[in-house]
C-alpha cells in the first residue's frame, strides 16, 4: 500500500497522510492535485507532496480522485512553498492558498472559455455546389444575405475551381450575426438546411495577440551601456546584483536588453513590480517588443484568467516573460534564467495580512537560486538591507548616476508651512509657492502631481465644543470621513457610520473634519483651479479592474493635467509633461513611530520627486514641512542617499536593528483585552527565559484592537548568524504550551518575520 502526504488549503501546519488506492498508484505523484475527504463530510483539493510506503500509526482515509494528468506544481515551486512556510513561520495551507489561483483549489472543474464558430458544410465546398446553395436560399432574403456575408468573411467566395484563392478564415457566429445584421434564428435556418454548421473552439481569456519585435529595442546610451555591461560582469561572480540608478535614468531600457539576452539563451524571465499601476505602463512598453511572449499576472485579473496563465506556464509553449506584482513569484517556470525586481525597496512587496507574511523580493531571490538563475534588483532608493549587502560584497553593485539624455534632477524647494501658517499665508494645505508653481505649469500646458499619503476627505471628525471623535466599534481607530459617499469609514475593518449632524455627546452641531486626505485636496484644488482637469489616484478610485489603466492613460494623453494621489503616484510612473510635484505634508511620513520612518520617508519623497522633469525640462518639487532643518529633508533636496545610509547605519548598529539584526514580531490576539494582556506577559516571560534581552514587550501596537480582536506585540531581535531553526523550534514550542492552557483556547498567536 502506498501513502501520500498532502497540503490542504486550510490554515494548518504540516502535511496530512492519505492512502493511495491500487488503481491510482501510477497517477499520484508529487505536484498533482487530489480530491481528499476530511472529517465526516467535507472534501478538499489537496496538493500531493510526497509518495511513500511508511504506514502511519493511525487509520488514514483513501484519496478519492486524481485531478491532474501531469503535475500542477513543479518541484522548484514545492521547495519555494516549503521555504516560505518555514522562514515566515506560516502554515503550509496558508502558502497553498496564497500561491494557487482559486480555480485550481475548487472542486468545480475549471471551464475554458469557448467561442462558437460557423463553417461551410463539406457538401458545398466547390464552385458548382456553392451556386446550388445560393439558389436554395434565394427566396429567403435574410438567409441569402447572411450566406453571402459568410462566404465573403470566410473567403469561400474566392474559389478558383474547388480551391479558395485566399486562405480560409475562421468566422465566429457572433461576427457573422453582426456583419449581416441577422438573428440567431436566420443562422439556425442555414444550419437546418445543411449549408452551414457550427463548432466550438477554446479561445482563452487572455490577449495573446502581437508578434514579438526585438528589432524595436532602442540602443542604449553610453551610461546605460556601461551599466548593462557592469551588470553582466557582476552576474558572472554574484547571484544577485543591485542596480542603483537615479530616477529617470532609463533602468527599464536596460531591463529590456537583459530580457532579450535571456530569451536568446532560451531562458524565461520573471519581472516583478510592486504595484499593479506600474504594470500598466511597463506592460505597454514590453508588449510592443515582446508581443505574445509576454504574460501579465496580478490580482486584478479574474480567477479564470489566472488559471489560464498558470496552465500556459505548464504547457510546452509557456510565456518567455512574466510581468507581475507580488503573487507572480508563485507561478511555475520550466527554464527560469533571470529575475528582475524593479523598485526593490517598496514595502508593497511584503504581504501583511493574511498569512503567509512573505516578502516577494526575498522569495524571488530564493526561487532564482533554485533554478540557478540570476536576480537583478533595481531602484533609485535601495532598501538599507539590499544596499548593505551590496556594500559588504554579498550582492554585486552597479550605479547609474545620470538621467537619460542628460535631463537634470528636479529642483526641490523646501517650504516652511509652520512659518507660513503663523503669517496666515497658507490656503488650506497649499503654500503660495505651490499654488504659483501649479498655476504656471497649467498655463504652459504642463502637468502637476500633488502627493498626500492619506486617502479619504479627513482623517477624523471632531466636535468643536466637547472634543468628541467618532471611533470604530470594532477597531481602536477614529473613523475617516469620505465625503463622496457621505460616510465615516474604518480603513481597517470597513465599518461605516453615517456622518453625524450633531454631537451625540453634547448636542452641538459644530462638527468638523480634522486634517486632509486626497479627497479633500481634490475638492479644494478644484475651487482654486476650476479650469484644471483633475484626477485622483488612491485605493478608493482604483478598486475596479480597469481603473488604473483609465487614470494613467488619461494623464499620459493629457485628458487630465492635475493628478492627486497617495503613494501609488510615487512608484516609477513616467509622464512626459509633469513639470511640478507638490509634497503636501512631509511630516506625516517623518513622525511615524517606527525605526524605518526616515528611510521610508526619504524613499517616498525621492521617488515622487522623480516624477518631475522629463523630456528635456528640469522639474520643480515643492516640499512642504514644519521641520525644514531636519537632516533627512536636506538629504532629499540633495538626493544624498549615501548620507542617509551612513547616518542611519550607525543608529541601526547601536540599537540592534536591521541590517545587523533580524526582527520577528510575535502578535497575540484575543477577544478580551484582559486575557490578551495576561497571555502576552506569560508568553514574553517564556521567550525571555530563552532569548534574554533580545525580547522586547509586550506592548500595545499603534492600533491595539482590530476587527474586535485585542492585540499585543512582542519584538525579538536576533543577531545575524543565529541558528534560525532553533529559534523557530523555541517559538513553536512556546506557542504549543500556550495552546494547552484551557484559559487560552481562543488565543491567536502569529508571526511577522522581517517586518516592515
Predicted regions and their residues:
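A short catalytic or substrate-binding loop motif that flags glycine-/basic-rich loops and adjacent residues
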Residues: 12, 455, 708
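Accessory, non-ATPase domains that flank or precede helicase/AAA+ motor cores in DNA-metabolism machines
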Residues: 1-379, 391-407, 690, 724-756
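A carboxyl-terminal module marker
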Residues: 685-710, 731, 749
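Short amphipathic alpha-helical segments
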Residues: 14-16, 172, 662-664, 710-712
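A general secondary-structure junction signal
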Residues: 50-52, 100, 200-202, 452-454, ...
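Residues at or immediately flanking beta-strands
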Residues: 478, 533, 694, 746-750
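Inter-lobe coupling/hinge segments of SF2-like helicase ATPases
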Residues: 215-221, 225, 237-677, 685, ...
Amino acid at each position: 500500500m502506498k501513502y501520500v502526504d498532502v497540503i490542504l488549503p486550510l490554515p494548518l501546519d504540516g502535511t496530512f497522510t492519505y492512502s493511495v488506492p491500487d488503481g491510482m498508484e501510477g497517477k499520484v505523484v508529487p505536484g498533482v492535485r487530489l480530491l481528499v475527504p476530511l472529517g465526516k463530510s467535507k472534501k478538499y483539493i489537496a496538493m500531493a507532496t510526497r509518495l511513500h510506503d511508511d504506514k502511519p500509526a493511525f487509520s488514514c482515509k483513501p484519496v478519492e480522485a486524481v485531478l491532474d494528468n501531469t503535475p500542477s506544481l513543479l518541484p522548484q515551486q514545492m521547495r519555494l512553498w516549503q521555504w516560505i512556510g518555514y522562514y515566515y513561520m506560516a502554515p503550509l495551507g496558508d502558502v497553498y492558498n496564497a500561491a494557487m489561483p482559486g480555480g485550481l483549489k475548487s472542486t468545480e472543474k475549471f471551464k475554458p472559455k469557448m467561442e462558437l464558430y460557423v463553417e461551410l458544410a463539406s457538401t458545398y465546398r466547390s464552385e458548382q455546389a456553392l451556386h446550388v446553395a445560393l439558389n436554395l436560399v434565394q427566396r429567403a432574403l435574410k438567409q441569402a444575405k447572411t450566406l453571402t456575408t459568410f462566404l465573403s468573411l470566410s473567403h469561400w467566395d474566392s474559389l478558383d475551381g474547388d480551391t479558395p484563392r485566399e486562405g480560409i478564415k475562421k468566422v465566429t457566429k457572433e461576427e457573422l450575426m453582426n456583419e449581416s445584421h441577422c438573428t440567431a434564428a436566420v443562422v439556425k435556418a442555414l444550419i437546418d438546411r445543411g449549408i452551414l454548421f457550427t463548432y466550438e473552439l477554446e479561445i482563452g481569456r487572455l490577449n495573446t495577440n502581437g508578434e514579438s519585435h526585438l528589432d524595436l529595442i532602442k540602443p542604449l546610451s553610453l551610461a546605460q551601456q556601461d551599466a548593462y555591461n557592469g551588470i553582466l560582469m557582476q552576474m558572472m561572480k554574484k547571484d544577485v546584483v543591485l542596480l542603483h540608478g537615479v530616477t529617470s535614468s532609463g533602468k527599464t531600457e536596460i531591463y529590456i536588453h537583459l530580457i532579450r539576452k535571456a530569451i536568446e539563451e532560451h531562458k524565461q524571465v520573471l519581472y516583478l513590480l510592486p504595484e499593479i499601476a506600474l504594470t500598466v505602463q511597463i506592460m505597454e512598453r514590453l508588449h510592443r517588443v515582446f508581443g505574445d511572449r509576454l504574460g501579465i499576472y496580478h490580482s486584478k485579473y479574474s480567477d479564470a484568467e489566472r488559471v489560464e496563465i498558470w496552465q500556459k506556464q505548464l504547457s510546452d509553449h509557456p510565456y518567455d516573460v512574466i510581468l507581475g506584482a507580488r503573487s507572480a513569484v508563485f507561478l511555475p517556470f520550466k527554464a527560469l534564467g533571470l529575475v528582475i525586481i524593479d523598485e526593490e525597496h517598496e514595502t508593497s512587496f511584503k504581504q501583511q495580512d493574511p498569512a503567509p507574511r512573505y516578502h516577494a523580493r526575498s522569495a524571488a531571490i530564493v526561487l532564482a537560486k533554485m533554478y540557478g538563475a540570476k536576480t537583478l534588483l533595481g531602484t533609485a532608493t535601495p532598501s538599507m538591507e539590499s544596499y548593505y549587502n551590496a556594500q559588504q560584497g554579498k550582492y554585486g553593485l552597479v550605479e547609474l548616476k545620470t538621467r537619460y539624455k542628460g535631463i537634470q534632477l528636479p529642483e526641490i524647494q523646501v517650504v516652511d508651512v509652520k512659518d507660513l501658517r503663523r503669517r496666515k499665508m497658507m490656503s488650506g494645505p497649499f503654500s503660495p509657492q505651490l499654488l504659483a508653481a501649479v498655476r504656471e505649469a497649467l498655463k504652459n500646458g504642463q502637468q502637476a502631481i500633488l502627493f498626500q499619503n492619506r486617502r479619504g476627505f479627513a482623517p477624523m471628525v471632531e466636535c468643536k465644543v466637547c472634543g468628541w471623535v467618532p471611533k470604530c466599534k470594532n477597531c481602536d481607530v477614529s473613523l475617516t470621513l469620505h465625503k463622496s459617499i457621505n460616510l465615516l469609514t474604518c480603513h481597517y475593518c470597513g465599518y461605516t457610520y453615517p456622518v453625524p449632524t450633531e454631537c451625540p455627546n453634547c448636542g452641538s452641531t459644530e462638527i468638523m473634519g480634522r486634517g486632509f486626505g486626497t479627497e479633500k485636496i481634490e475638492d479644494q484644488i478644484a475651487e482654486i483651479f476650476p479650469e484644471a482637469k483633475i484626477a485622483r489616484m488612491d485605493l478608493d478610485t482604483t478598486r475596479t479592474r480597469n481603473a488604473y489603466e483609465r487614470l494613467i492613460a488619461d494623464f499620459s494623453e493629457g485628458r487630465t493635467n492635475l493628478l492627486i494621489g497617495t503613494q501609488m503616484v510615487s512608484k516609477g510612473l513616467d509622464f512626459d509633461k509633469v513639470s511640478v510635484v507638490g509634497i503636501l505634508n512631509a511630516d506625516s511620513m517623518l513622525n511615524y513611530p517606527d525605526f524605518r520612518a526616515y528611510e521610508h520617508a526619504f524613499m517616498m519623497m525621492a521617488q515622487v520627486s522623480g516624477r518631475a522633469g522629463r523630456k528635456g525640462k528640469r522639474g520643480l518639487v515643492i516640499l512642504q514641512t514644519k521641520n525644514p532643518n531636519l537632516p533627512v529633508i536636506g538629504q532629499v533636496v540633495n538626493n544624498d542617499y549615501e548620507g542617509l545610509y551612513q547616518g542611519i547605519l550607525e543608529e541601526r548598529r547601536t540599537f540592534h536593528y536591521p541590517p545587523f539584526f533580524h526582527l520577528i514580531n510575535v502578535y497575540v490576539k484575543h477577544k478580551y483585552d484582559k486575557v490578551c494582556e495576561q497571555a502576552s506577559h506569560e508568553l514574553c516571560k517564556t521567550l525571555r527565559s530563552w532569548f534574554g534581552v533580545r525580547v522586547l514587550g509586550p506592548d500595545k501596537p499603534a492600533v491595539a484592537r482590530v476587527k474586535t480582536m485585542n492585540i499585543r506585540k512582542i519584538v525579538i531581535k536576533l543577531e545575524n548568524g543565529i541558528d534560525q531553526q532553533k529559534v523557530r523550534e523555541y517559538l513553536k514550542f512556546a506557542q504549543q504550551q500556550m495552546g494547552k492552557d484551557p484559559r487560552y483556547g481562543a488565543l491567536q498567536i502569529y508571526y511577522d518575520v522581517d517586518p516592515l
